[in-house]
Each structure stands twice: as C-alpha cells, then as structure tokens.
Amino acid sequence: MEFSERKRSRKSQSFKLVSRDYHHEVYKISEFSNDVNGETKETQPIYLGDESMEIKKQITGMRRLLNDSTGRIYQRVGKEGEKLKQEPQVVDLVWPQRSNSSTEASQGLHSNSRGAWNELPTQSGQFSGQSGPRSRTFQTQPHISASSNGELPGVNSIVGSNCCTCNCQSTLQAILQELKTMRKLMQFQAVGTQNRQQPPISLMCSQRTAVSRKRNKKKKVLPKTVQPVTAVEPKPSPLETEKKPAASATRPPGLQAAERTSTEENHVLGFGIVLESPSSDPEVQLAEGFDVFMPKSQLDSILSNYTRSGSLLFRKLVCAFFDDKTLANSLPNGKRKRGFNDNRKGLDQNIVGAIKVFTENYCTANHVDKLPGPRDWVQILQDQIKLARRRLKRGSAEVADGDERLDRISLPPTGHTFVIKRETPEDPEPGSVA
C-alpha cells in the first residue's frame, strides 16, 4: 500500500498546523459502514482510479469551501513534549485501499451501500458546521477499526473489483452533487439575509444625496447665499414694476433705461435682496446672513461700471461703504494693533464679509476674471488703506496750499503798506547824505 508522510509545521506549543493538501475531515466520511449483522463498523475506503480521485478532489474542494474558508486544520496537542513524536503515524494522506479480510464484508458493503451513503449527507452537514479545536481533536484521535470478531482488519494492496469501483463512483458523484446543492443553498441564504438587511436602492440613493448635500453645505458657504437669493428675489419684482411708473414721470429717459438694464441684470443674475423702503430708491441686502444694505441705484452704477475684474469690484464696494478717514485709521483684518500710541481699529468684518460674498457670487455667475483668492482680500484692503492715507495727506497738503495761497493773496496790500512805512524813515537818510 502506498503511504506518504503527513507534513506538519509547528504553530505554537498547543497547536500544530497541518498542510493544506491534507483534509482529514473528507477522508473520515467513508470510514463508517454497516456490518452484515447491522452493527456499525469502521471500514477503510476503497482506492479508486483516476476518475474517482478527480471526484474526490472536487469533494474535498467543496468541503473546504463549506467547512473553512482558509482550509487550515489546527490539531490540539497535549502539553509540551507529550506524545508529539507518536502522531505522524496516525493518519495517512492517500486514500487507503479496501481491506479484504472477509467476503462477507464486501457483500455487506454491496447490500448496505445505499443505506450507508444515505447517511453521509447528514454527516457532511455535521462536519460543515463544526469549527474550533474540539471537533478537530476528535478527528485526530487514532481510528481503531474492529470487525465483528474483534480483530483488526489488515490493509490489502489489491485493487477492488470494477463493479465496486462503479458503485463508488456513482456514490461519490451523488455526494459531490449534494455538496454543490448545499453550497448553493448557503449562498442563497446569505444573499437573502444581505437583501433583508440592506434598504432598497431608492432609499440608499436618497440618503446618499442628502448626506452629500449636508456635506456641501457645511464645507461651502457660497451655495447658501446663492440659493435663497434666487428664490426670494422674484417676489418683490411686481412691487418694483408698480413703483417704476410713478418714478418714470419725474426722471429723464436716460436714467430710466439705465435702471431698466440694471434691474434686468439683477433679476437674471439673482444677486442682492431688494427690500421695501418708503423712499423711491429701495435698498438691497448684499448677502443673506449679513445685515448690510446698500441703495439700489448706487449698486447698479457700480455693477455697470466696475465689473471688469473681481478685485476692482471689491475695491469700489469697499470705497462705497468706508470713507477715507475710517480706512486710514483702521486695520484690514479686524484686529486691533497692540500699540499704546496706535489708535487704529479693525474694519467692520460684517460689512467686509458681505462685500466678499457678494463679489464671489457675482463673479462666479457672470464668469468675471481675476477673482481674488483667499489671501488677496486682506491685501486689497491694505492697498485701499494706503490709498486712503495718501488721499488724506494730499488733501491736507492741498488745504495747506490753499491757505498759503489765500495768505499770499492777502499779503500784497499789507506788504505795500509796510513798504510805505519803511520808506518814510528812509527819506531823511539821502537828505543827510546830501
């Protein structure tokens, strides 16, 4: 009989890892059969040809899938140095050949083979559910085959008859078919449980879109300002149309045309929230969330003249809200400088934030070039502060020059009188010289 040694590799003090080629669970299936008297008896499985070996390999593969995904078998071992050397001679790798100790056993195998194989699916179900060291320790115990007389059957190297091999091939094929059906059932059950746990696709899509919207709202502030503006702005449009006929009688036609174009641009672009006001010129809220308002006519004039670049629009809006004195005595980032002699204060960040949001929305909607970056806003404010200081210096210098000019204009008559006074005492000097 052909034997091959089972390879082992040391895993730990209490476990040994059997190589993946060995699958003791599979070989143990055919070790039980019924005796002639009906008693259970362990018999060695029959060595079959190449076809049967292929079927057995398929069975081992299916059992590997059903039992353990990794295919590893850990066997429990006693304490250190306790019966570790005696284990390799217990189990074989090769499917052993059938023992021909008695002809009655072969007849019993033929007569009761169908009953024995019918019991195998239940055993396979039991083996498929087992996991852990207990089931495997039971498998590693030496199997003592005993006949009805109590004698140990010998192992014979003679191959069984063709009839027996045919019967075993059919039974092996039946086992393989049942294992395949079991695997399909397990897969269907797993898919059914997953489908029960997962919500329907429509709900998943709606949840994902809601989550993505929330994330976008948290990250970006701009869409918040744009969306409500477009929804709120068309409402006051009929009020504006009612106010236009009353104001058109008093205003020239050129201003009326300019206002029409500007209002159309505002309605199309959706910027600024027009608010009702008792005066003829309504106020516009630059951005939602900021209590910053601006006369609509002034905003229309800025949008019609200074929309070449986003930085220019931002500069003009800053100049519209802050005069030169406030800019000259302020800091761009809203913080107070830590100096005892420095009285400068930060700019109102509410106004600056509203202007910034308005320019960003306008430039992105109208595709205006040169939109200021995150670091450019403070630089633009610093430039505007410097320009305001220069204007104040020039204005003070011009005022001083104007005062000097006024003094010069008033000085000649007074100088003339002084010259007359000076000439009177100088008259006797030439007389004295003469």
Swiss-Prot record:
It comes from the Eukaryota. GO terms for molecular function: DNA binding. The modification Phosphoserine is found at S330. Residues 289-399 form the BEN domain. Pfam families: BEN (PF10523). Residues 96-151, 212-262, 414-434 are annotated as: Disordered. InterPro entries: BEN_domain (IPR018379), BEN_domain_protein_7 (IPR053072). Residues 212-222 have a biased composition (Basic residues). Keywords: Isopeptide bond, Phosphoprotein, Ubl conjugation. The keyword Phosphoprotein applies. The modification Phosphothreonine is found at T326. There is a cross-link at K16, K56, K85, K244 (Glycyl lysine isopeptide (Lys-Gly) (interchain with G-Cter in SUMO2)). Residues 97-150 have a biased composition (Polar residues). The keyword DNA repair does not apply. This is BEN domain-containing protein 7. The gene is Bend7.
